[in-house]
Structure formats: structure tokens, C-alpha cells
């Protein structure tokens, strides 16, 4: 008995962001969602953390990824990466010396090293 593609169940997909790199080929993806509070009916922000298999080690911290449900890969991993939706914006750290920092930071001026303002004569009426 073979099943046609129309009868086959589709797998669940979720979109979330990479919150942790927990080892080789393993990441944690946080999927945010909103749900109403059962008593007060206020919309509450919640999140689910999924353990995801990253075969190529291509996802970085902060990336937005699409994950799909799959067979169990390990004790906790039941999801795998389908695609990276958006890369995280990263800034490269630049080494600077203390003299560069001192030149850019303004210094405090005190009354002892600033000249006194000149007095203006009062206008005559």
C-alpha cells in the first residue's frame, strides 16, 4: 500500500532565532509566540526552545532560521534546519589603544583652568 504525495502528512515548520550553539552540529532555536492568559485574557509573550540539528554548522548566534520536524537525532533533537531566513548583523571588533580612546573621550573642564567670562557693560537707557 503506497501513499500518494497528496495523502502524506506535511511536517511542521517553525521560524525562530538561534539562541545558543551547544556543540558540534547542534543549536538551540527560540521560537516566540503569543497566547492569551487563561484567566485575564491578556495576550502574553511566550517562547519555546527547540534543540535543532545543524548538519553544515552554518547557523550563527542571532540568525533567523526555519526549522522542520524530523526523526529523532538524539535524546532531545527532533528538528533540523531547512534554511537561514536572515543572517544576524555582526560588528567586527577593532583593536584600539588607550591613547586613541583618550583622544576621543572629552575631558572635564574645571573652573581653575578655564578663563573667566568677560563682563558686559550694562546698556544705558
Swiss-Prot record:
The keyword Transport does not apply. It comes from Opitutus terrae (strain DSM 11246 / JCM 15787 / PB90-1). Part of the 30S ribosomal subunit. Belongs to the universal ribosomal protein uS17 family. This is Small ribosomal subunit protein uS17. It holds the Pfam family Ribosomal_S17. Residues 1-21, 101-125 are annotated as: Disordered. One of the primary rRNA binding proteins, it binds specifically to the 5'-end of 16S ribosomal RNA. CDD domains: Ribosomal_uS17 (cd00364). SUPFAM superfamilies: Nucleic acid-binding proteins. GO terms for cellular component: cytosolic small ribosomal subunit. GO terms for biological process: translation. GO terms for molecular function: rRNA binding; structural constituent of ribosome. NCBIfam families: PRK05610.1 (NF004123), uS17_bact (TIGR03635). HAMAP family: Ribosomal_uS17_B. Keywords: Ribonucleoprotein, Ribosomal protein, RNA-binding, rRNA-binding. Signal peptide: none annotated.
